[in-house]
Regions:
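Transmembrane alpha-helices
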Residues: 129-133, 165-198, 227, 231
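Periplasmic/extracellular loop-to-transmembrane helix junction in inner-membrane transport proteins
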Residues: 3-7, 33-74
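Hydrophobic alpha-helical elements at and bordering transmembrane segments
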Residues: 58-62, 66, 96-103, 143, ...
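Short cytoplasmic-facing helical segments at TM-TM junctions of multi-pass membrane proteins
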Residues: 142-181, 210
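Hydrophobic alpha-helical transmembrane segments of polytopic membrane proteins
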Residues: 209-247
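Transmembrane alpha-helical segments of polytopic membrane transport and secretion proteins
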Residues: 1-21, 241-257
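Transmembrane-helix boundary motif in ABC transporter permease subunits
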Residues: 71-101
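Generic hydrophobic transmembrane alpha-helix motif, especially the helices
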Residues: 102-138, 145-146
């Protein structure tokens, strides 16, 4: 199994490298086909990115975005996992929550921004709340859907042995839903990241990668636009493929041995 795991890991890395190469190739072909002021080439943007990441302004924007992401994404995971597990032992609560999520998740995350700006004013809090809303739905749904597939024989056996609802959640449901929970966390991150960048662009307040991208667009700085898009994509890939994937393998190590 360990050799199979290594082969699978190598295939995933190769697929990622090929995907990046394909994207860069298509980008460069587009740059050759259009004037420089409309589509700068890959080398130009990479050189600009290398220069930008060494500036204090970039570090301030990066820290601002990561701070908002951490607050919103962390809150969403805690609430989503908590409510999802509660739904495992409270059937009516689960059905009400799932119905509410079906209704609310159809609303684009960016549509919440004006509401929370009016309620909370300018600052980090409305962006954090929007990020939390965007990430909450996949986190909660993944846990609730996973709890429905838990074998009832295990639940019944635990109840026969006198397990309380808390014990059921901690010793039966949580271990059983862990794989789906991690997958839900990755889906939630994608939602959170998109909501963060969109909200920062719309709010136009404070420092962040979304605000930096918006400013580049306002000043018709196409190199700056592509540089910020590239920075946003690279950072998202690093968080998802390095941090979250490694965490996934550590938490689910028993499945790979």
């Amino acid at each position: 199994m360990s050799s199979q795991r290594r082969v699978t890991g190598l295939r995933k890395k190769l697929a990622m490298v090929l995907a990046i190469a394909f994207i860069l190739l298509m980008w460069q072909i587009a740059a050759w086909s259009l004037p420089d002021f409309l589509m700068p080439g890959v080398p130009t943007v990479l050189a600009r990115l290398w220069g930008d990441i060494q500036t204090p302004a970039f570090r301030v924007a990066l820290w601002g975005s990561l701070t908002r992401l951490g607050g919103g994404y962390g809150a969403a995971l805690l609430l989503g996992i908590g409510f999802g597990l509660i739904g495992a032992v409270l059937f009516f609560f689960r059905e009400v929550l799932k119905s509410a999520i079906v209704i609310l998740q159809s609303i684009p995350s960016i549509a919440w921004v004006p509401l929370f700006l009016i309620l909370m004013g300018f600052g980090n809090l409305p962006i954090i709340v929007v990020v939390a809303i965007a990430a909450f739905f996949p986190a909660a749904l993944s846990v609730m859907n996973a709890t429905e597939s838990v074998q009832q024989v295990h639940v019944s056996a635990a109840r026969v042995m006198g397990a309380s609802r808390w014990s059921l959640l901690r010793r039966v449901y949580l271990p059983a839903v862990m794989p789906e929970l991690i997958t839900g966390a990755q889906l939630a991150f994608g939602n959170a990241w998109r909501a963060l960048i969109s909200a920062e662009m719309l709010v136009g307040f404070g420092k962040g990668l979304g605000r930096t991208l918006s400013y580049a667009g306002e000043t018709a700085d196409m190199v700056g636009v592509m540089t910020n898009i590239l920075a946003i994509a690279i950072l998202a890939a690093l968080i998802d493929q390095v941090i979250l994937e490694n965490l996934k393998h550590r938490l689910l190590r028993y499945q790979y041995v």
